[in-house]
Each structure stands twice: as structure tokens, then as C-alpha cells.
Amino acid sequence: MDGRAVAPAAGTVLNALATGVGAAFALDIDTEASVSVTPSESGVSGEIAGHPEADTALVERCVSRVIDRYGDGQGGHVRTESEVPLAAGLKSSSAAANATVLATLDALGVADEVDRVDAARLGVQAARDAGVTVTGAFDDAAASMLGGVAMTDNREDDLLFRDAVEWHAAVWTPPERAYSADADVARCERVSGLAEHVAALAAAGDYGTAMTVNGLAFCAALDFPTAPAVTALPHAAGVSLSGTGPSYVAVGDEDGIEEVSTRWHENPGTVRETTTQLAGARTT
């Protein structure tokens, strides 16, 4: 029994490390998962295309979680292939988890019967099992699974709201990498007052301002430079450090984002122009 699914990356509106409340938005950069479920075998194996040495514990745990809930003790194999760079702050783990959960549900023939929010929670549980997240990252998972902007309380895995937003986006990813599980949570908690302000801005629909305040606050908390955000500000509706870095994401209209992209190309690393994504994760 085989299943396939894709899930988008995401950018940050509000980093949840300060208060447990976070918000993110889906980006049109995909991760694809292919899952084979075999009744005659036990155990789960995994591979990540192009990264033979990468840790596959997360996606393997996603398959196991789904089979434990909806299967009958089958074994399985998962292969993911991604446009999303690993450890870059673009929610590669959430995208991989969502795609794997949906692909496994598809392989079991129950993808249409499972609520998408519940499916995202399965991936979050697997991420906690695998130790790849501090907060559970339900905000990232919800944005990737549902599309658009999602705000969540990660302490309860509670979806506070989801909204549809359409932006052009520029993504700058420096050469270095940063792992979410290594983030200095204590320093992030020191900007909790600003995080609460960001949450209020986002709840009022002022996502661009929310992003920008979040970006400046968490650049300070996580020791990333603010210069890339300041460079983008005159041309963007909002700009933020994405997740725990090192990527930055700017959003706005097409002309403004082209200007941001041009300026960010002066830096080492890679720059990508894309758009927000409203459809979320889906089987294929």
C-alpha cells in the first residue's frame, strides 16, 4: 500500500519560544513524502533524498504514530524529497512531518477521513518524540498543513485562528545552519513582553507589523544581525527572522519583493522569490 503527499514550508509571524503562542504562514516551497506500508513487515525505515546521512527519526516516527492510530501494526518505509533547506528556519521539519503523516494516511486509505488539524497534531507529537522541537511547533505545523496564516497555543496544541493572506515573499538563507532544538529558550523568554505585543498585532490582522517586531526582537534574543531586516523594511510589508534562523523572510507586493531580493543577493547564501500558499498540505 503506497501513499504520497506534499506539504509547504512556512515563515514566521511570531516565534513561540517566548510565550508558547506562535504564528506562521505557509510558503510555496514544497516537501514531498512517499510512504509504503507493508502488512507482512514490522518496523519503519526512512530516507531523505540527497541527504543520505540525515537523521530520519522524525519521519519514521510520523509513520509509526499514524500506523499506531489508524493501522494494524504494519511496517513501512518513507522517502522525503524537499525544496526546503534543512535547519534554515523555514519549517523543514514541520513540512516533512505533515507530508509524511498525510502520505501514511493515504497509504492506509483513510486520508479523507482524518481532520487536517488532527493530522498536524500527529506530526507535532512525532516531532516531540524525535526531539527536533522545543515548543512542539504546532504553529508551523498548522500553517503548513492548512495554508495561510495560523496562530496557535503550542502549550495546548490549540489552533487559535487561521487566515488567508496573499503575499509575494523573498527568502534569504545564509550558508550557516541553526537547529531549533539548540535555541537559547531563556534568552527568548526575556522578550516575552514584545512577543505578547506581536500576538496582539497578529490577532488584529496586522501581520506585517507583527512580523517586523518579532524579527527585530528575536534577532536580538538569538544573536542574529538586524541588518538584513533593516535593508528590506523600506520595500516590504513585513520582514522577520524565520524561526530560530538563519533565514529571513520578507513579504509584500511583487515590486517591493523584487527590490528586497535584489538587495539580499548582495549577501552570501541563497535568495528565493516565492509566494504565500493557501492550499496547505495535500495528497498527490
Swiss-Prot record:
InterPro entries: GHMP_kinase_N_dom, Ribosomal_Su5_D2-typ_SF, Ribsml_uS5_D2-typ_fold_subgr, SK_arc. It holds the Pfam family GHMP_kinases_N. ATP binds at P85, L86, A87, A88, G89, L90, K91, S92, S93, S94, A95. GO terms for molecular function: ATP binding; shikimate kinase activity. The keyword Signal does not apply. It is found in: Cytoplasm. Its EC number is 2.7.1.71. Keywords: Amino-acid biosynthesis, Aromatic amino acid biosynthesis, ATP-binding, Cytoplasm, Kinase, Nucleotide-binding, Transferase. Pathway: Metabolic intermediate biosynthesis; chorismate biosynthesis; chorismate from D-erythrose 4-phosphate and phosphoenolpyruvate: step 5/7. Its main location: cytoplasm. GO terms for cellular component: cytoplasm. Belongs to the GHMP kinase family. Archaeal shikimate kinase subfamily. NCBIfam families: Shik_kin_archae. This is Shikimate kinase. The lineage of its organism: Archaea, Methanobacteriati, Methanobacteriota, Stenosarchaea group, Halobacteria.
